[in-house]
A protein has these predicted regions:
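Alpha/beta-hydrolase fold nucleophile elbow
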Residues: 227-239
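Cleavable N-terminal signal peptides of Sec/SRP-targeted secreted and luminal proteins
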Residues: 7-23
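Mature extracellular catalytic domain of secreted serine hydrolases
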Residues: 47, 100-121, 196-205, 215, ...
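Non-catalytic accessory segments of hydrolases
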Residues: 2, 23-210, 231
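Alpha/beta-hydrolase active-site loop
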Residues: 202-225
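Positively charged n-region of N-terminal signal peptides that target proteins for export
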Residues: 1-7
Length: 282
């Protein structure tokens, strides 16, 4: 929910790429209460909470309230996957489908991560219930706007969807920006015999965070037209580890056809020495 700052400019390295539901939670029957923020230029100040029955947009995840700040519309904390807890931990994400669900803003919904890069209990923050996304769009009624799908950085061990406020990008370039969370650290990228030897199919992967992004992209393809976006013009973009994940999505068969262009900002690839490659085979 916290919007930290406007991003002012991008240095882009552009890669052009031309390019697959279960679970219904308990329905919420009481009117939802929403937190409201006042636009103060480069930040948003909390101004209280109220119950509001206004403009809602229907999605496969439920009904989400349209909120307005100066020059933009925004929708926050939309669940695109069931919480990856219990039997869903270290497995491919499962889509959240509940059309009668009223989506409430959810505080502190960034994915579980280390603070300061040290594995100590006192430095842990976040929640495993974190697979949510935000949408920013220009104010006014328009259709078929280009969609930009943001992937945050942080070494795939830290970061969250709320770090950048894309209001200026949305207003200046007339685009829609979608920013999801994805699982991080050992909950998102983890290789262990208990996973590889006893799971089957896509659950055998070690890249659960990448699969979260794939599912978020599927959600965008199915729902973004309701927000004025063009599902046939989706650009994925990310910085640092987010740029690395962009490159991963370019070669992931599960992501084929889900986006049309890609921007990797300070992205990177990794390679192993021949000696280590032989070790992994043995």
């Amino acid at each position: 929910m916290n919007l930290l700052r406007n991003i002012k400019s991008f240095k882009l390295i552009i890669v052009i790429f031309c390019g697959t539901v279960v679970g219904v939670p308990e329905e919420i029957t009481n009117p939802p209460t929403y937190d409201y923020y006042q636009d103060k230029g480069d930040s948003f100040n909390y101004i209280g909470a109220k119950t509001y029955k206004g403009d809602f947009i229907q999605t496969t995840s439920g009904k989400v309230l349209s909120q307005r700040a100066e020059g933009i519309l925004y929708w926050e904390d939309i669940p695109f996957a069931l919480p990856p807890l219990g039997n869903l931990r270290w497995k491919a994400p499962v889509a959240f489908v509940a059309e009668d669900f009223h989506i409430n803003p959810k505080e502190n919904n960034f994915c579980h991560q280390e603070i300061g890069g040290q594995i100590q209990e006192i430095n842990q923050a976040g929640s495993e219930d974190c697979l949510y996304l935000d949408i920013r769009a220009p104010h006014g009624s328009r259709d078929n706007l280009p969609v930009m799908f943001w992937i945050h950085g942080g070494g795939n061990t830290s970061g969250h969807k709320d770090f950048y406020n894309f209001s200026e990008l949305v207003k200046r370039k007339d685009v829609i920006v979608v920013s999801p969370n994805y699982r991080l650290g050992p909950l998102g990228f983890f290789t262990h015999p208990a996973i590889q030897d006893y799971h089957s199919g896509i659950d055998k992967t070690s890249n659960f965070g990448i699969l979260d992004l794939v599912l978020a992209l599927k959600w965008v393809n199915e729902n973004i037209a309701s927000f004025g976006g063009d599902p046939n013009n989706i650009t994925i973009f990310g910085e640092s580890a987010g740029g690395h994940n962009v490159l991963s999505l370019l070669v992931a068969k599960q992501a084929k056809g889900l986006f049309h262009k890609a921007i990797s900002q300070s992205g990177y690839t990794k390679s192993s020495s021949l000696q280590n490659a032989y070790k992994s085979e043995n």
